[in-house]
């Protein structure tokens, strides 16, 4: 149930670019971090290359692409190896979509506490406890 924000900059243009990015991010998040794509939310935003600076120069000036991915997941649900594999796979796939990437391209796996994070009006901790008690999460809230 991650919430993922993708900001990107590229000179490549395609009517399906944002959908391609969202699809790739969803696929790798499911495959490597084991997150259910049916409860994954992805926001994709384009940033003009003249407005993105890395290493002191704009991406437009350097003729390079970049992205910033911020993914929120429940704390302790992924290993260090999974997170490292996710960053590496994402860098490779996003380069295929966006073109040559600036070395200063970032991804942040933000591990948040289950009692402070959730969706549909319920925290992840409440869902976890309800699952252990074998009751519906909304009934556990009553």
For the regions a language model picked out, list residue spans one by one.
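A domain-level signal for the structural core that forms small-molecule/cofactor-binding pockets
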Residues: 1-142
């Amino acid at each position: 149930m991650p919430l993922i924000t993708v900001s990107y900059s590229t000179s490549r243009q395609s009517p399906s670019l944002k959908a391609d990015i969202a699809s790739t991010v969803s696929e790798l998040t499911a495959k490597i971090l084991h997150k259910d794509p049916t409860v994954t939310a992805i926001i994709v935003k384009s940033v003009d290359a003249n407005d993105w600076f890395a290493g002191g120069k704009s991406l437009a000036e350097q003729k390079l692409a970049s992205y910033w991915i911020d993914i929120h997941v429940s704390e302790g649900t992924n290993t260090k190896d999974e997170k490292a594999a996710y960053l590496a796979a994402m860098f490779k796939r996003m380069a295929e979509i966006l073109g040559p990437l600036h070395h200063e391209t970032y991804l942040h796996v933000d591990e948040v506490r289950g009692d402070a994070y959730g969706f549909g009006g319920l925290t992840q901790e409440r869902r976890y406890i309800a699952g252990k008690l074998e009751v519906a999460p909304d009934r556990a809230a009553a």
